[in-house]
Design a protein with these regions (language model features):
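Hydrophobic h-region of N-terminal signal peptides that target proteins for export
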Residues: 12-20
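Short helix-capping/linker turns of helical repeat alpha-solenoids
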Residues: 25, 50-53, 67-70, 88-91, ...
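Hydrophobic face of amphipathic alpha-helices that form TPR/SEL1-like repeat modules
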Residues: 28-32, 59-68, 97-104, 133-140, ...
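Terminal, low-structured helical/coil segments at or just beyond the last alpha-helical repeat
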Residues: 209, 215-279
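TPR/TPR-like alpha-solenoid repeats
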Residues: 48, 63, 86, 101, ...
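N-terminal leader/linker segments that initiate helical-solenoid repeat arrays
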Residues: 19-51, 55-62
């Protein structure tokens, strides 16, 4: 018969094992990717993936398809297998990766309809990347009939929640009159909200750091460090694109319109409590 003391001991042992396993996963899989030890990362992630860890399965799949240079041979079949296993466990990042794989057509044959199904699964959870994915499908008619109004509504939903790529998409919708009446003031406002996620000084420093990293990249060895920064890379790309589009809009707008747009952007940021990116 189990006593209360025995139950407590068992509980503490279970918690201890769980914490220990998480620490091992962090140091044995994720940290190896961050330190660009790609082959070692594959070996370590495989251990945890075989134990059913969905994050490890997703990372392992990403390593097989996303590691580059150094003579590394990509294995798209293994990549898809591991990521799909994690997705079936309802792991959101894996489900999003499934959508992107079907949309991209590199890891598996392009199938926009399947991409839509996975985006919908993720969007139903309120995931902003999933909502943005649906917006892009409807905006460009990928696997679905073009529906600019639907795209606009999805962009708006995610943009109001602070999703940078969606804020860019919303700004472009206003600029191009896609799903909404053309409004350059609102276009400028939303693009500037996205662009201002990083101040100019930090942006220049980041651009220089990225340029230096690319120039000094050792292509004789496998590279996988970038896989630990995919979310940041997506946001940085959106911010950079927003900055370019603002320069274009400045050529098409009056000083009065620009000032009105800046005021609107400040009002939206204050109302929605938007903050700058912390990377």
């Amino acid at each position: 018969m189990l006593t209360l003391r025995n139950l407590m001991t068992f509980f503490l042992m279970t918690i201890g094992l769980s914490v220990h396993a998480e620490l091992d996963f962090q140091s044995g899989c994720k940290d190896l990717i961050k330190s660009n030890q790609c082959i070692e990362a594959i070996e370590a992630c495989t251990i945890f993936a075989n134990q059913g860890n969905p994050e490890a399965q997703t990372l392992l799949g990403s390593l097989y398809s996303g590691t580059r240079y150094g003579g590394f041979r990509k294995n798209y079949k293994k990549s898809f297998t591991w990521i799909s296993m994690a997705a079936e466990q309802d792991y959101t990042k894996a489900q999003l990766a499934m959508a992107e794989m079907y949309k991209g057509g590199e890891v598996v044959p392009e199938d926009a309809r399947k991409a839509k199904v996975w985006y919908e699964k993720v969007a139903e959870k309120g995931n902003l990347d999933g909502i943005n994915g649906l917006a892009r499908l409807y905006r460009y008619g990928t696997g679905v009939r073009k529906d600019y109004e639907k795209a606009f509504q999805y962009y708006l939903q995610a943009a109001l929640a602070g999703h940078t790529p969606s804020q860019v998409g919303l700004g472009l919708s206003y600029r191009d009159a896609k799903g909404v009446k053309k409004n350059l003031v609102k276009a400028y406002a939303w693009l500037s909200i996205a662009a201002d996620k990083i101040d100019t000084q930090r942006w220049k420093a980041m651009e220089k750091r990225y340029k230096d990293e690319q120039e000094n990249l050792d292509k004789s060895t496998p590279q996988c460090k970038h896989l630990s920064k995919l979310d940041q890379m997506s946001e940085r790309f959106a911010i950079g694109y927003a900055r370019q589009m603002i320069l274009d809009l400045k050529q098409r707008m009056s000083i009065k319109q620009i000032n009105k747009a800046k005021k609107l952007a400040l009002e939206i940021k204050k109302e929605r409590a938007f903050t700058r990116s912390d990377f």
